[in-house]
């Protein structure tokens, strides 16, 4: 057996340098962060041959005390903290005291520094870890640090460096990130004596963005912000016009520290996808300001990753801020006059609408708390419908006027019978039977009657209007239907095109999402429980979030090992595979880190709303188009479907005149 040896200082420093000094860009990052911590207002970075031959950092910061210049290159020597408790209250970018000794062990270093009250500056040189005497020198206030011939004594590390152009590009990238994080500091970057970057340090973040990314990017970004007692998030997110196929144009800063965090990036991306149809990554610059004690920056050698005390809370704050900014931008495009928005709507009249509903596998979905009771009792609903309904009916559920007639609208394309839009089902309507959606293979499954039904429903449109409704777009006049897919309308010289499927889909989506948020979830017992086998990791995540599943309407019991027995599931939007629904929500929780019940169900609701909505190629009558558009005007976001596709587009008279060359 080999004996244990104590490594000498030179070997230990080279090992430590392997973690901190990965490449020239790592050196540049550490030295610039030291300049920022020294309150520099102007920082000049000069590199040659990709930083391998020379890295020079010049700043006008506070400088270093004469007696501390030699100490600065000792391992774990730092001015940032004094005791272990300070690690959890970090206000500076550096704190470990590892960067300078690590750099000095693998490069030829020269440091000059002067404080404002000193008459002279002081200089020290270190080569391969061996330091010279500290001597006087002439220098302005601040610090100049040069690193030459990087990795001259570690040829194995030097061999793994990329090309000069690639190393230069990596240095340029880190300097631009630090410039974004510090708009009050002027940065100048010179590559082989050629200036490649110059920010002006005027404190305007948008000026820095324009300098780095150009005018086209700056003209297509939106500001977002949100704050609470514990956290503030703000920044800029790009429109889909500047989305890219990679995440290179994404920057995240926590307390001005540049980090990489996939979960936080996904928060922005998920909000972006709600308003975009392109399969690309959004441009964004995200700033998070949080109390230092709520983050741990001491978990990564280069401090590129940090740990949050409550990442889910931060995720939701970011998602909400970005989503609101993008939504407001769309709303402004369709903004209506104040008088149009506040004027009193005329009282609607009752109108008789006949809906012919042909029989499919499921006739009518009965959405009330009565569903669970009636299923468990297994009574004959046809014979006892009215009495059973009255015995379990809860008036607090708004007279059960939220029933959805799903996938029951079939129309004869040869005769072009009108497709119907789902309306409220009155409590005294006859219900032939209630089908158990989740027990296709169960012997006790209730069989559906095959007789078609025809309902004449009296609809009070006023019941659906909220108090003081706010319309999101003007009251357009319906012109007609184009290609049995798009509804055409006009208002004040502007032509509107509405995707009828996307419009109806979004109406259904928001309706069901609201019901879930209000807690009126209907529970569907399974006749035959479903056994779900989970991995150890998935089971642990379920244990951590079991309350979320219970609130979402799942009844799950342990079934030995990491298996679960699924006995009850939420009932919404018709037929769903209960096992797949559970696993989808579990994956959503793992990927997004979001614990809000309605949000983890987002994808499932969107999918079912899509299937339940009227389709393209469905002919609509004029009164149906009017009703659909009127309902669309008053939902929260009528401009995008749940999948991010646009619902409405508009053309001004100028746009159309340009197409016909009437104006140039």
Curated annotation (Swiss-Prot):
One annotated GO molecular function: ATP-dependent DNA damage sensor activity
CC terms in the record's Gene Ontology section: mismatch repair complex
Presence of keyword Lipid metabolism: no
Pfam families: DNA_mis_repair, HATPase_c_3, MutL_C
InterPro entries tied to this protein: DNA_mismatch_repair_CS, DNA_mismatch_repair_MutL, DNA_mismatch_S5_2-like, HATPase_C_sf, MutL/Mlh/PMS, MutL/Mlh/Pms-like, MutL_C, MutL_C_dimsub
PROSITE patterns in alphabetical order: DNA_MISMATCH_REPAIR_1 (PS00058)
Keywords annotated in UniProt: DNA damage, DNA repair
Gene3D superfamilies named in the record: 3.30.230.10, Histidine kinase-like ATPase, C-terminal domain (3.30.565.10), MutL, C-terminal domain, dimerisation subdomain (3.30.1540.20), MutL, C-terminal domain, regulatory subdomain (3.30.1370.100)
Record-linked SMART domains: DNA_mis_repair (SM01340), MutL_C (SM00853)
BP-aspect Gene Ontology terms: mismatch repair
Family: Belongs to the DNA mismatch repair MutL/HexB family.
Role of this protein: This protein is involved in the repair of mismatches in DNA. It is required for dam-dependent methyl-directed DNA mismatch repair. May act as a 'molecular matchmaker', a protein that promotes the formation of a stable complex between two or more DNA-binding proteins in an ATP-dependent manner without itself being part of a final effector complex.
Alphabetized HAMAP family for the sequence: DNA_mis_repair (MF_00149)
Protein name per UniProt: DNA mismatch repair protein MutL
């Amino acid at each position: 057996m080999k004996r244990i040896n104590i490594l000498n200082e030179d070997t230990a420093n080279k090992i430590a340098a392997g973690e901190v000094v990965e490449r020239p860009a790592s050196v540049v990052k550490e030295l610039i962060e030291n300049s920022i911590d020294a309150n520099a207002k102007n920082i000049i970075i000069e590199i040659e041959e990709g930083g391998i031959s020379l890295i020079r950092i010049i700043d006008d910061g506070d400088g270093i005390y004469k007696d501390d210049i030699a100490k600065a290159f000792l391992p774990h020597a730092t001015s940032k903290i004094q005791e272990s408790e300070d690690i959890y209250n970090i206000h500076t970018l550096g704190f470990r005291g590892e960067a300078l000794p690590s750099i000095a062990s693998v490069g030829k270093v020269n440091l000059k520094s002067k404080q404002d009250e000193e008459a002279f500056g002081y200089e020290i040189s270190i080569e391969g870890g061996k330091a010279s005497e500290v001597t006087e020198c002439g220098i302005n206030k601040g610090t100049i640090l040069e690193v030459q011939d990087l990795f001259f004594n570690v040829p194995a590390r030097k061999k793994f460096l990329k090309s000069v152009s690639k190393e230069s590009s990596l240095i340029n990238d880190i300097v631009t990130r630090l410039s974004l994080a510090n708009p009050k500091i002027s940065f100048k970057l010179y590559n082989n004596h050629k200036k490649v970057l110059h920010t002006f340090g005027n404190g305007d973040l948008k000026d820095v963005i324009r300098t780095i990314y150009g005018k086209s990017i700056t003209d297509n970004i939106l500001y977002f912000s949100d704050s609470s007692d514990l956290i503030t998030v703000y920044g800029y997110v790009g429109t889909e016009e500047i989305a890219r196929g990679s995440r290179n144009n994404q920057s995240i800063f926590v307390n001005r520290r540049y980090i990489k965090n996939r979960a936080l990036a996904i928060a922005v991306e998920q909000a972006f996808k709600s308003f975009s149809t392109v399969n690309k990554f959004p441009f964004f610059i995200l700033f998070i300001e949080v109390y230092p004690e709520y983050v741990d920056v001491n978990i990564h050698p280069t401090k590129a990753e940090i740990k949050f005390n409550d990442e889910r809370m931060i995720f939701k704050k970011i998602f909400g801020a970005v989503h609101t900014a993008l939504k407001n931008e769309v709303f402004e495009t369709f903004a209506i006059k104040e008088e149009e928005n506040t004027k009193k709507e005329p009282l609607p009249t009752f109108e008789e609408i006949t809906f012919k509903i042909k029989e499919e596998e499921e006739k009518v979905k009965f959405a009330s708390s009565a569903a669970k009771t009636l299923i468990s009792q297994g009574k004959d609903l046809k014979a006892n419908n009215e009495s059973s309904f009255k015995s379990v009916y809860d008036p607090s559920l708004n007279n059960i006027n939220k029933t959805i007639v799903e996938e029951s609208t079939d129309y004869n394309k040869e005769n072009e019978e009108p497709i119907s839009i789902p309306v409220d089902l009155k409590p005294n309507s006859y219900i032939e039977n209630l089908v158990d959606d989740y027990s296709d293979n169960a012997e006790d499954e209730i069989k559906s009657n095959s007789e078609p039904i025809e309902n004449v429903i009296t609809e009070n449109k006023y019941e659906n209007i909220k108090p003081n409704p706010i319309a999101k777009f003007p009251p357009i006049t319906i012109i007609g239907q184009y290609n049995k897919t798009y509804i055409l309308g006009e208002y004040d010289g502007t032509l509107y095109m509405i995707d009828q499927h996307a419009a109806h889909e979004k109406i259904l989506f928001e309706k069901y999402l609201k019901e879930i948020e209000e807690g009126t979830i209907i529970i569907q017992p399974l006749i035959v429980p479903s056994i779900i086998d989970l991995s150890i990791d998935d089971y642990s995540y379920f244990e951590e979030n079991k309350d979320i599943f219970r609130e979402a309407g799942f009844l799950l019991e342990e079934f030995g090992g990491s298996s679960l027995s699924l006995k009850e599931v939420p009932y919404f939007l018709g037929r769903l595979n209960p096992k797949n629904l559970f696993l989808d929500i579990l994956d959503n929780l793992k990927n997004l880190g979001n614990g809000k019940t309605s949000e983890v169900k987002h994808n499932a609701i969107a999918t079912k709303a899509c299937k339940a909505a009227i389709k393209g190629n469905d002919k609509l009558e004029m009164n149906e188009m009017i009703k659909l558009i009127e309902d669309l005007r008053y939902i929260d976001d009528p401009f995008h479907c749940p999948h991010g596709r646009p619902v409405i587009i508009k053309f001004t008279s100028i746009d159309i005149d340009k197409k016909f060359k009437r104006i140039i």
